[in-house]
């Protein structure tokens, strides 16, 4: 495991961590019951099987 040679300041640590950004999931169109919904790709199978409500309610 990599170990730093010296202590990193709090401001450097926080500025390094702030570079990470969350990304919006890519949405895919799925037709369920005659209605088309846009859901994340990882939930397509669950929506088709009826395990997840595509309306999100």
UniProtKB/Swiss-Prot annotation:
Any GO CC annotation of this UniProt entry: large ribosomal subunit
Keyword Membrane: no
Keyword set, alphabetical order: Ribonucleoprotein, Ribosomal protein
GO MF terms held by the record: structural constituent of ribosome
Compositionally biased tracts (Basic residues): 1-19
Gene Ontology terms: biological process: translation
Chain positions covered by the region annotation Disordered: 1-22
InterPro entries from the UniProt entry: Ribosomal_bL32, Ribosomal_zn-bd
Xref: NCBIfam families: rpmF_bact
Protein family per UniProt: Belongs to the bacterial ribosomal protein bL32 family.
HAMAP family in alphabetical order: Ribosomal_bL32 (MF_00340)
Name of the protein: Large ribosomal subunit protein bL32
Provenance organism: Rhodococcus jostii (strain RHA1)
């Amino acid at each position: 495991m990599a170990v730093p040679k010296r202590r990193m300041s709090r401001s450097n640590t926080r500025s390094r961590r702030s570079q990470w950004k969350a990304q919006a999931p890519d949405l895919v169109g799925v037709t369920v019951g005659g209605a088309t919904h846009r859901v994340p790709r990882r939930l397509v199978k669950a929506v088709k099987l009826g395990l997840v409500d595509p309306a999100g309610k």
